């Protein structure tokens, strides 16, 4: 399993309120800094990734004051938000959340129910990159190409190997048949 890139590292970060630290303390990559919100539900923190990017999850490292209920939302403009994850069973500690990959510039944790006496508090708010393959082949792929003549006899068989990710190439079977002479 490939480690996903932390897209939020040192990116501009904003919050509805702050009672401890700064919002940027949740995205600075340090283990000894944190952000905490006012003691209220409906508090939030969001990060600006700088451009629209594929996002496939978040990692929330809660301090003792965690979110029992919260949503993860994404946006292209920081005004209109789309929910990609919601829970009312948060237990604190580290929540590593994955969701179907979505393109977004802004990612927000929106608290809806406090899990402790104080406001939401995060050691880190990591936005995890998606798993979309980059241009060309990724680290490992295996493709087997077989060419057959009209009678079904194999005339060429080639194997190509490269990469670490498994991909489904069955769509190659839907390509039009090539005419060989």
Regions found by a protein language model. Give the residues of each.
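Short edge beta-strand segments in beta-sheet-rich domains
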Residues: 94, 120-122, 140
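Disordered, acidic Ser/Thr/Pro-rich linker "stalks" and the adjacent N-terminal cap
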Residues: 1-55, 61-70, 76, 80, ...
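Short tyrosine-centred short linear motifs in exposed loops/low-complexity segments
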Residues: 53, 103, 137-139
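Short, flexible loop/turn segments at beta-strand junctions in immunoglobulin-like
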Residues: 98-101, 134
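Carbohydrate-binding surfaces of carbohydrate-active enzymes
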Residues: 1-6, 129-180
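Short beta-strand-plus-loop segments that form exposed binding edges in beta-rich domains
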Residues: 110-117
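Short, conserved beta-strand segments of beta-strand-rich sandwich/propeller modules, principally
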Residues: 57, 106-108, 140-144
